[in-house]
Amino acid sequence: MRKYLLIHILVISFALLSAPVILAEEEPAITLRSSYSDLSLLSVQSMHNISIRKKDEWGFYGHSTIIHRYEKRSINGDGVVIDHATGLMWHPSGSSDYMRWNNTNNWIRSLNYKGYAGYKDWRLPTLDEAVSLLESSRKNGGPYIDPVFDGEQWGIWTGDIHGSRGVWSVYFSLGNVRWNVKNRYIRPVRSLK
């Protein structure tokens, strides 16, 4: 009888102590800004969840401080990467060609029309979301991004602008963030909620 009571108490204790951990897994630990904005250089250099190695007049060199929990998954035959730490679902590669920023809407619209991975709410990431992918070091001699993602996209557009001067981009090839007007790739994202 004592043995049964002890086991019963241990099982109940485990269940009660595990409840907060299970709930924490369901909710993202970090919520990143998901609406586009006109960002100044100072506001970009003051972003949360980053470590800056060097600031310059175009942006900064640095990396995310977020501890990611990536899960690679196939949905309807389409690959996705889910980040349980931020509650974001990423396209694992994105566009195979780089393009001007004013052409990104057509590419995203086509992806949504096809219903990639069963969803029609894909978009360009905000700078906060895109910079969250920057790693502190090159991975396997490749870019500054986790190898769960395709490393071909060396620089990606965001939906955030820098006044009339340009658009904010993240460069996985150099581990930096900067504004520009040249051609970049697209790595679409969607919020899980």
Residues covered by each model-derived region:
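Glycine-aromatic-enriched surface loops/turns that form tight recognition elements
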Residues: 20-123, 127-193
